[in-house]
């Protein structure tokens, strides 16, 4: 933000960037849900031997009630009951006010920032032991369900990969061509080294310097804008992660025989979109927020164990899609805000 200098320009760029990221994330989740419901990856898995006594399925609500419930009535109660949408909205509201207050709220802002860093460090420490836990969970799952679950898991992977491909090579490139008239094939050729680096590292944060340099040297995008937009995208733009979450919700819901209503699908789109805001660009972070997406529509979080074992490969693909979305957004902003 310091690189842009002019606060008026900063505000315009910031608003356009965030709106683009939120819009493409909502589209990404919609694509994921559509692909998953078309392929039905969880159909055919039997779970008669899996105990569901601890599974709580949320009572279905009308769409209007779902939208009204986004507004937090009591943030403390929402935290206590793990009602994720009001919590996210309240957190966003607090963050906006802290940003508006500036230095006057620096102590509170620093506390939340450091507390978030602490939680992320704690989470990543736990994630280091995840392979052992995942092995045990998968072993138990296959003991109950059987190895017939391999085919649905491959279908799940296929759904995620197909949705990622649609988002990256259709949605992004269509937006790029319509608003900038850039040749999508030339764009992909020039940006491919960054996509490849993101794929191998599975972290958006590590690609920030390479993205900025590539966009500047090969695509002629101003560093003044890219130095603000790209780091913001590494935190806010998680289209690939949202796609995984959309497919995972349908996959696990079908395994447990849960029918999601239209209002549930809208809730998934809203929750996954809002959950992407503030998500760190580190490997497999999408699994951390996946639980809140499941909880928002009453899908059992136990189902996450099924997909954790194959998530690393998909995480690499998701990261490549995420940073491509950042670059497309920056190209659009560059055209509308020439510097």
List the predicted regions and their residue ranges.
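Signature of multi-pass transmembrane helix bundles
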Residues: 8, 16-188
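Transmembrane helix-bundle signature of multi-pass membrane transporters/permeases
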Residues: 17-22, 93, 114, 157, ...
């Amino acid at each position: 933000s310091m690189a842009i200098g002019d606060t008026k320009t900063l505000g315009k760029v910031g608003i356009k960037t965030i709106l683009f990221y939120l819009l493409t994330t909502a589209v990404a989740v919609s694509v994921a849900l559509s692909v998953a419901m078309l392929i039905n990856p969880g159909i055919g898995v039997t779970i008669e031997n899996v105990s569901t006594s601890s599974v709580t399925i949320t009572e279905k609500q009308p769409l209007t009630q779902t939208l009204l419930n986004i507004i937090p009535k009591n943030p403390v109660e929402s935290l206590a009951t793990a009602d994720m949408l009001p919590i996210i909205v309240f957190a966003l509201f607090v963050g906006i006010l802290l940003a508006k207050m500036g230095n006057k709220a620096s102590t509170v802002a620093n506390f939340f920032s450091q507390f978030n860093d602490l939680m992320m460090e704690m989470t990543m420490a736990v994630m280091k032991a995840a392979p052992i836990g995942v092995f045990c969970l998968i072993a138990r799952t296959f003991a109950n369900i059987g190895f017939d679950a391999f085919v649905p898991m491959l279908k799940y992977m296929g759904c995620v990969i197909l949705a990622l491909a649609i988002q990256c090579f259709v949605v992004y490139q269509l937006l790029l061509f319509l608003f900038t008239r850039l040749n999508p094939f030339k764009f992909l050729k020039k940006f491919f080294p960054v996509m490849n680096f993101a794929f191998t590292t599975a972290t958006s944060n590590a690609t920030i310097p390479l993205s900025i340099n590539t966009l500047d040297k090969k695509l002629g995008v101003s560093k003044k804008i890219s130095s603000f937009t790209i780091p913001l995208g590494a935190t806010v733009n998680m289209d690939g992660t949202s796609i995984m979450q959309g497919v995972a919700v349908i996959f696990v819901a079908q395994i447990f025989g849960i029918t999601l209503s239209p209002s549930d699908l809208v809730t998934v789109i809203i929750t996954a979109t809002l959950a992407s805001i503030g998500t760190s660009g580190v490997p497999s972070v999408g699994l951390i927020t996946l639980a809140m997406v499941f909880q928002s529509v009453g899908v059992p979080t136990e189902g996450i164990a099924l997909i954790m074992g194959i998530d690393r490969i998909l995480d690499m693909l998701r990261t490549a899609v995420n940073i491509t979305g950042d670059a497309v957004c920056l190209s659009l902003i560059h055209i509308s805000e020439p510097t």
